[in-house]
Amino acid sequence: MTRPLWDYYVSSSHNTYLIGHQLVGESTIEGYIRALLHSCRSVERKPIHSFLFLTHIVFTAVDIFDGDKEPLVTHGNSFTTKVSLRKACEAIAKYAFVVSPYPVIISAEIHCSIPQQDMIASIMREVFGESLVSAPVKDRPKINHLPSPEELKGRILLKVRFDLCSVTYQANSCE
């Protein structure tokens, strides 16, 4: 577990927050809990392609949209229910390292306004605390390759994809 992270395949799941059908199913934190407790190492889109197969890194997906008060996790353009981003993060924080000490990678697809993006950052900092990777790993001044799973034990990484159309629209409408 000392090679760079990208040298490992990561076992994955899709729409971890959904129970049932992806167009009309229920969104719940139970999917995250189940995945974490069964060593499911999940991703929304594609696994990390490389040489070794690793089953102890969680790669889990979160589709985040504006909520009335705080951001919500739901499947866009569908009739699925919604779950609080805070509750999803709390479930991930509670169960992330019960089965494995290796990193959890959250793949977030952001469809939120700028104010709710700020809330996402605040919620994740508050809930994940020091576990959230927010700077280069200690003693790695320049990133030529990703840290190893060993270096990332007990850490949560965030991989983000923004819906630039909604962000651009939001910025232009604020003028």
Spans of features found by a protein language model:
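Long, acidic (Asp/Glu-rich), low-complexity accessory segments flanking structured domains
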Residues: M1-S42, H49-F59, F65-E175
